[in-house]
Amino acid sequence: MIMINSPSYLEFCNISKHFPGVKALSNISFRANKGSIHALMGENGAGKSTLLKTLSGLHQPTEGELVVDGKALVFNSATDALEQGIAIIYQELNLVPELSVAENIYLGQLPTKGGSVDVETLNARAREQLKRLGEDFDPSRPLKEFSIGQWQMVEIAKALSRNAQIIAFDEPTSSLSQREIQNLFKVIRELRDDGKIILYVSHRMEEIFDLCDAITIFKDGTHVQTFDDMTDLTHEKLVELMVGREINDIYNYRSRSLGESGLRIENLEGKGLTQPVSLDIRQGEILGLFGLVGAGRTELTRLIFGAEKAQAGQIYIHGQPISVRSPQDAIRAGITLCPEDRKADAIVPILSVEENTNISARPWNLKLGGLIDFKWERDNAEQQRKALNVKTASLQQAIGQLSGGNQQKVILGRWLSTDMSVILLDEPTRGIDVGAKSEIYELIFNLAERGVTVLVVSSDLPEVLGISDRVMVMKEGAVTGELQRHEFKEQTALSLAMLGNNQAAA
């Protein structure tokens, strides 16, 4: 076993990784140097996550090797890689909320005294690790009492406690506030300056250009190009290299004829709303719902879908009042939801693409005697896969192995299998790269053109303005304004979201 100590470089030498029916990585070669934050970018499914899993010891390369300062590394497990000085900070943090901060940092290496855990030493060591990161919160308290941003610091402290010299970050800012993001960037820069080798995966281009010194671009499991200096690299060139084509207008908005009222809400009240909410969306219309964290957007979709019980108000579908006491009631009425956290609330990761596609369609295809029509399910899943261009090795592949963009397509395909007339999309492109985003937008427009009523919740303001016919803005659980398409201005929407009034238009 090689213990990595102050390495000068990490090199991926002709790395390939094959799964049954899929070449996830093909002949990947590049070098990440000490004193540089090295970005990994590509569309979802380009191979970034597979490469990190190879680096972490979760996957063994089919071909090729990892080299540090001229010496080949061999891992038999993720624990093996960590012991050799390699740590991966994943988007889904590998922590235990019920344990203390200190216990999470030193889990597996707890100091003992007299046959039991030496709590005093444990907390002192944890406090010192947090101090290195500029944090001073109490390590003896349960982790669940702290914010996601502080959880990130705990994960980094955990890596440093094991003397990690190579640290990779996989979409670390997806759940962080702007202040927490800036704090994280400060820590990452300090780690770089301290001699660590840093790899950084993100789909947010503004982060890449703000934080990173070098970049490697992937496409379809292959290495496209590495820039050791990003000075002359533009956003447009990066997108072109990622997707293999120019994307001039990622939204490609197009108007369409609208029908009668598709979804109408009158004076809806419930959890997360501070004032009654009313809205009316026509058939074929795309209504964007914008607001900052805590605005009540997600809470509103959950009330409409029956995931939270409304305290007052009335919902109408095609002008007819309906009673929604549960998601089952909503689905029967033709209301569907793609939730904000698809991994927690929308997919069953260990089940196949076929099974996830048909979860909500099964009540419509039971044979006489209560038997499931498996042929119908196979045919339906294949039909949705083709229609939505889902990239998967087979319909039997576990959905948890797919990229975020392809998971989102499967969720959309699930609802296309039902008698859907209304779809609620909560952060539909979060964690999805620019190429897959354009495909999701195209699917949204196709739904609207079929007469489906669409509500899109997004914290990405350019996205909301790019695809919506109208935009409704919320702040602290209340609607603060509505904009028609000819009124769309970022300043106006932000003013409504932050101040609760349209000062930008004054």
Swiss-Prot record:
<keyword id="KW-0067">ATP-binding</keyword>
<keyword id="KW-0472">Membrane</keyword>
<keyword id="KW-0547">Nucleotide-binding</keyword>
<dbReference type="InterPro" id="IPR017871">
    <property type="entry name" value="ABC_transporter-like_CS"/>
</dbReference>
<feature type="binding site">
    <location>
        <begin position="42"/>
        <end position="49"/>
    </location>
    <ligand>
        <name>ATP</name>
    </ligand>
</feature>
<dbReference type="InterPro" id="IPR050107">
    <property type="entry name" value="ABC_carbohydrate_import_ATPase"/>
</dbReference>
<feature type="domain" description="ABC transporter 2">
    <location>
        <begin position="253"/>
        <end position="501"/>
    </location>
</feature>
<keyword id="KW-1003">Cell membrane</keyword>
<keyword id="KW-1278">Translocase</keyword>
<feature type="domain" description="ABC transporter 1">
    <location>
        <begin position="10"/>
        <end position="245"/>
    </location>
</feature>
<dbReference type="GO" id="GO:0005524">
    <property type="term" value="F:ATP binding"/>
</dbReference>
<dbReference type="InterPro" id="IPR003439">
    <property type="entry name" value="ABC_transporter-like_ATP-bd"/>
</dbReference>
<keyword id="KW-0813">Transport</keyword>
<comment type="subunit">
    <text>The complex is composed of two ATP-binding proteins (AraG), two transmembrane proteins (AraH) and a solute-binding protein (AraF).</text>
</comment>
<keyword id="KW-0997">Cell inner membrane</keyword>
<keyword id="KW-0762">Sugar transport</keyword>
<dbReference type="Pfam" id="PF00005">
    <property type="entry name" value="ABC_tran"/>
</dbReference>
<dbReference type="InterPro" id="IPR027417">
    <property type="entry name" value="P-loop_NTPase"/>
</dbReference>
<dbReference type="InterPro" id="IPR003593">
    <property type="entry name" value="AAA+_ATPase"/>
</dbReference>
<comment type="function">
    <text>Part of the ABC transporter complex AraFGH involved in arabinose import. Responsible for energy coupling to the transport system.</text>
</comment>
<dbReference type="GO" id="GO:0016887">
    <property type="term" value="F:ATP hydrolysis activity"/>
</dbReference>
<protein>
    <recommendedName>
        <fullName>Arabinose import ATP-binding protein AraG</fullName>
        <ecNumber>7.5.2.12</ecNumber>
    </recommendedName>
</protein>
<keyword id="KW-0677">Repeat</keyword>
<comment type="similarity">
    <text>Belongs to the ABC transporter superfamily. Arabinose importer (TC 3.A.1.2.2) family.</text>
</comment>
<dbReference type="GO" id="GO:0015612">
    <property type="term" value="F:ABC-type L-arabinose transporter activity"/>
</dbReference>
<dbReference type="GO" id="GO:0005886">
    <property type="term" value="C:plasma membrane"/>
</dbReference>
